[in-house]
């Protein structure tokens, strides 16, 4: 089974077992909802944990796990990653995609390859994709209708029509 990474444990917070997560998932408020199950991976072993609290704090997601009420219970998890089963994903509407479907796609302008989507930034109005280009500076592409012409997640191919000045160098 292919597990889906949803966060990295950046640190602990306070003394009551709260964890500071760097989320790598879309819809964190649904993914880390109280009562949901996530899996912590360590040495190839996936251990289930139930979310007992969730809140946002700056750019971090703060959670506690059921039964883990002290910093000593969770400190050993710093730096580890959290995963979910692929079955935990909800159906999305048309023109909606999960991050893991977009990250790793190759971006083209016509037949010219621009690079590969390496990261998705949430900006509020629309997402912005970071495109890694071999030997060149990264390019930031807004996920808007005027720029993104088509997405084929099966072929891992994205076709864009860049605005003037969007891609330089």
Swiss-Prot record:
NCBIfam families with a match to the protein in the record: 16S_RimM (TIGR02273)
Gene Ontology CC terms: cytoplasm; ribosome
Name recorded for this polypeptide: Ribosome maturation factor RimM
Domain comment (free text): The PRC barrel domain binds ribosomal protein uS19.
Subcellular location per the Swiss-Prot or TrEMBL entry: Cytoplasm
Keyword annotations: Chaperone, Cytoplasm, Ribosome biogenesis, rRNA processing
Domain of life: Bacteria
Subcellular location, principal: cytoplasm
Subunit structure: Binds ribosomal protein uS19.
GO terms (BP aspect): ribosomal small subunit biogenesis; rRNA processing
Residue intervals of the PRC barrel domain: 93-166
HAMAP family tied to this protein: Ribosome_mat_RimM
Listed InterPro entries: PRC-brl_dom, PRC_barrel-like_sf, RimM, RimM_N, RimM_N_sf, Transl_B-barrel_sf
Function: An accessory protein needed during the final step in the assembly of 30S ribosomal subunit, possibly for assembly of the head region. Essential for efficient processing of 16S rRNA. May be needed both before and after RbfA during the maturation of 16S rRNA. It has affinity for free ribosomal 30S subunits but not for 70S ribosomes.
Similarity comment: Belongs to the RimM family.
Pfam families documented for this protein: PRC (PF05239), RimM (PF01782)
GO molecular-function terms, A-Z: ribosome binding
Organism name: Exiguobacterium sibiricum (strain DSM 17290 / CCUG 55495 / CIP 109462 / JCM 13490 / 255-15)
Keyword rRNA processing: yes
């Amino acid at each position: 089974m292919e597990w889906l990474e949803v966060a990295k444990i950046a640190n602990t917070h306070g003394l009551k077992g709260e964890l500071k997560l760097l989320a790598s998932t879309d819809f964190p408020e649904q993914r880390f909802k109280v009562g949901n199950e996530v899996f912590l991976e360590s040495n190839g072993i996936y251990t289930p944990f139930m979310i007992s609290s969730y809140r946002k704090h700056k750019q971090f997601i703060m959670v506690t796990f059921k039964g883990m009420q002290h910093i000593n219970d969770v400190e050993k998890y710093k730096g580890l990653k959290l995963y979910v089963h692929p079955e935990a994903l909800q159906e999305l509407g048309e023109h909606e995609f999960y991050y893991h479907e977009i990250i790793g796609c190759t971006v083209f302008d016509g037949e010219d390859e621009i690079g590969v989507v390496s990261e998705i930034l949430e900006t509020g109005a629309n997402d912005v994709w970071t495109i890694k280009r071999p030997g060149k500076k990264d390019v930031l592409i807004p996920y808007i209708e005027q720029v993104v012409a088509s997405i084929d997640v099966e072929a891992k191919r994205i076709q864009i029509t860049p605005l003037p000045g969007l891609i330089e160098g």
